[in-house]
């Protein structure tokens, strides 16, 4: 997984006092947060999480959570940074990260896909969008997507009806799901995520280059300024537009 750049590279170093193992992990050059990402960054991060859960299940492991904050980007490549999320799978146990995945990945993606104005909601719900809210905000036509029907609408309805998680916990612990069924669940989530498309609406920047008042001479001057700045800073691989 490290060779495929799905996990950061790491070295095992002398263990610290009281530690079983100590790992020195590759540093991420730029830290970003899910509520800052574009639609397709969030979708790529969701796909990575599901890919790792699939690989984990094949080796009798599982991700104990599915937080979007477990993912960072190196360039345009998502990378899963929380190595401690992997744990031994308890036989026939449900996926502990399922609800969190739906709240932090699937609900924001579905809402942005069907109603672009809802795309900024994750900034107000750091822990994920409550499913009993998400299913009410999605348009009725989303119900005809089998994946959203199961993972958002029915999930949200059940959460609303049986909302007291303390009372529900004993029943959840009684649920049994074998490896095959869990792989099918993850596969269903992957198909649903892959089916969603980013919003396509005209915005302030849609026709920027065709409507801009830059003349050819002004554009050339701007390019010259940028090239000069890059040369002075050593031409690093990472740039940030400060406006």
What are these regions (language model features)?
Residues 48-51, 188, 225, 229:
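Amphipathic alpha-helical segments that form well-ordered structural scaffolds
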Residues 200-231:
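Class I SAM-dependent methyltransferase Rossmann-like catalytic core
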Residues 40-64, 108, 112:
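Conserved kinase catalytic-core helix
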Residues 2, 6-45:
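Conserved structural core of kinase catalytic domains
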Residues 233-243:
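Conserved class I S-adenosyl-L-methionine
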Residues 94-198:
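N-terminal auxiliary segments of SAM/dcSAM-dependent transferases
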Residues 31-39, 171-175, 206-214:
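Glycine- and acidic
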Residues 62-116:
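Catalytic activation segment of kinase domains across protein kinase-like and atypical kinase folds
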